[in-house]
Each structure stands twice: as structure tokens, then as C-alpha cells.
UniProtKB/Swiss-Prot annotation:
<dbReference type="Pfam" id="PF02639">
    <property type="entry name" value="DUF188"/>
</dbReference>
<comment type="similarity">
    <text>Belongs to the UPF0178 family.</text>
</comment>
<protein>
    <recommendedName>
        <fullName>UPF0178 protein BCG9842_B2187</fullName>
    </recommendedName>
</protein>
<dbReference type="InterPro" id="IPR003791">
    <property type="entry name" value="UPF0178"/>
</dbReference>
Length: 146
């Protein structure tokens, strides 16, 4: 198993790096050049930089990921593609994307886009909380323990 992180806006990178390096599972952070950092990463953690295009990180992750790799993303489109490839896919708020829930998530995203396109407003996501982080940590640890 390898872990790939859609890292541009991922608030749980620290959890992923800490927990994965403890069990020696390699982590690849995929992020745009606009988030470039000279910060040194622990052993077993690699950062891949991609162009700042809308889906550049998603495409790179899909090139790299193999069946049974673990991907962390908040992007439903990437999650859908990764599930089809046989990957395990987690959201940073602590839930697992599945073939049972991805269709509903994509449908909700589409309907919200249509509402916005018509000039109306939609509610954004709720703020990320410490409880969300701990929920993610518990789920992540259970996924990498296998």
C-alpha cells in the first residue's frame, strides 16, 4: 500500500504523515507549485509538484495510484475515479468514499453547481473542526492497520 494525498487544501497532512511513517507506509503529497515549500519531509514522505491547473494534482494521483493504494482527497471526481481503480479513498472529515455513497455525493455536487449557475447561492461546507480531525485519525489508523 502507498498513500497519495491531494495536498493543496488538505488539513490532515500532519496526521497522515505521523501515522503513516509510524508504520512505515510511504506517503506522496501531490500539490501545485503555488504551494511550494523548502520544508524537509520525514523519511518515507515525498512531495510531487504539479502545475496549478484545476485538476493537475488529480491527474497525477491517478497516474501513480494502483489498486489498494489509499488516497486522501476532498474532490468527489477524483474519489470516483480512484474507487473505479480499486483504491481506498478517504475524506479529511473522517469518512470513507464508497461505491454506495459516491453517486449521491456527485449528484449533490452537480445540483449545487446548477443552482449556482442560475445565480443563486448554496451553502458551503461546514468548518473543519478538531472533532473532524480526530474522526479522520481514527478512520485513517484503521485503514492502514490492515
Amino acid at each position: 500500500m502507498k498513500i497519495y494525498v491531494d495536498a493543496d487544501a488538505c488539513p490532515v497532512k500532519d496526521v497522515i504523515i505521523f501515522e503513516a511513517t509510524n508504520v512505515e507506509i510511504p506517503v506522496t503529497l501531490v500539490t501545485s507549485f503555488s504551494h511550494y515549500s523548502n520544508a524537509e519531509q520525514p523519511k518515507g514522505v515525498e512531495t510531487i509538484y504539479v502545475d496549478s491547473g484545476a485538476d493537475a494534482a488529480d491527474y497525477r494521483i491517478m497516474q501513480l495510484a494502483k489498486k489498494e493504494d489509499l488516497i486522501v482527497t476532498q474532490d468527489y471526481g477524483l474519489a470516483s475515479l480512484a474507487l473505479a481503480k480499486g483504491c481506498i479513498v478517504l475524506h479529511h472529515k473522517g469518512y470513507k468514499y464508497t461505491n454506495d455513497n459516491i453517486e449521491q455525493l456527485l449528484q449533490t455536487r452537480y445540483l449545487s453547481a446548477m443552482v449556482r449557475k442560475s445565480g443563486k447561492r448554496t451553502k458551503g461546507p461546514k468548518p473543519f473542526t478538531a472533532e473532524d480531525k480526530e474522526k479522520f485519525r481514527a478512520l485513517f489508523k484503521s485503514m492502514i492497520a490492515h
